[in-house]
């Protein structure tokens, strides 16, 4: 992974829970396209029809709180979201996102809908290119970057088995 992500912002507030991300009535849906067509329906009904591949969510505190459902980060990723920046995350959402290869970044960033943001996962620099402001985050280490680059934990594990690379490096 090159470590730099750039995209258009969708702004959300605090306490965006998993039921807002993907309402419970869709949890028995196995189609990723169907999940993506309802993503963020509980928070912003227009999101699913307007999100584009490469978009970034910027939110407040406690993003992904509520019930544990892996479908929440899966739906976001399949809809085209390439990263989520929030002041804090629910732990299970954070792990589920990393496990599927969706970068989740803890930082307080001022950005509005439509702003363009760049995130350097290696250096820890976040820039709001529209507003001209810069922020810091804890950089991802090489091991975490390799999980994200491989598309998530399962793919990383399978690649590790295939190549014989130890997961202890980095």
UniProtKB/Swiss-Prot annotation:
Entry keyword annotation includes Cell inner membrane: no
Function per UniProt: Component of a hydro-lyase with broad substrate specificity for cis-unsaturated tricarboxylic acids. Catalyzes both the reversible dehydration of (R)-homocitrate ((R)-2-hydroxybutane-1,2,4-tricarboxylate) to produce cis-homoaconitate ((Z)-but-1-ene-1,2,4-tricarboxylate), and its hydration to homoisocitrate ((1R,2S)-1-hydroxybutane-1,2,4-tricarboxylate). Is also able to hydrate the analogous longer chain substrates cis-homo(2)-aconitate, cis-homo(3)-aconitate. These reactions are part of the biosynthesis pathway of coenzyme B.
SUPFAM superfamilies: LeuD/IlvD-like
GO biological-process terms attached to the record: coenzyme B biosynthetic process
Site (Critical for substrate specificity): 28
E.C. number: 4.2.1.114
Oligomer status and interactors: Heterotetramer of 2 HacA and 2 HacB proteins.
Top enzyme category: lyase
Key word NAD present: no
Catalysed conversion reaction: (2R)-homocitrate = (2R,3S)-homoisocitrate; (2R)-homocitrate = cis-homoaconitate + H2O; (2R,3S)-homoisocitrate = cis-homoaconitate + H2O; cis-(homo)2aconitate + H2O = (2R,3S)-iso(homo)2citrate
Pathway note: Organic acid metabolism; 2-oxosuberate biosynthesis
Name of the protein: Methanogen homoaconitase small subunit
One matching Pfam family: Aconitase_C
Keywords: Lyase
Classification via HAMAP family: LeuD_type2
Similarity comment: family membership: Belongs to the LeuD family. LeuD type 2 subfamily.
Motif extent (YLRT): 26-29
One function term, GO molecular function aspect: homoaconitate hydratase activity
Top-level lineage group: Archaea
């Amino acid at each position: 992974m090159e470590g730099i992500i750039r995209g258009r912002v969708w702004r959300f507030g605090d306490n965006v829970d998993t039921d807002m991300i993907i309402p419970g009535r869709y949890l028995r849906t196995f189609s990723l396209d169907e999940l993506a067509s309802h993503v963020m329906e509980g928070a912003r009904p227009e999101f699913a029809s307007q999100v584009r591949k490469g978009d970034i969510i910027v939110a407040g505190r406690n993003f992904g709180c509520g019930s544990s459902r892996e479908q929440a980060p899966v739906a976001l990723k399949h809809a085209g979201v390439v990263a989520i920046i929030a002041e804090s995350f629910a732990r299970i959402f954070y792990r589920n996102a990393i496990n599927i290869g969706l970068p989740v970044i803890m930082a307080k960033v001022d950005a509005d809908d439509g702003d363009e943001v760049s995130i350097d996962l290696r250096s820890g620099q976040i820039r709001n290119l529209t507003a001209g402001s810069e922020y810091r985050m804890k950089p991802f280490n090489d091991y975490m970057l390799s999980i994200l680059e491989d598309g998530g934990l399962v793919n990383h594990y399978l690649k590790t088995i295939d190549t014989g690379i130890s997961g202890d490096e980095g």
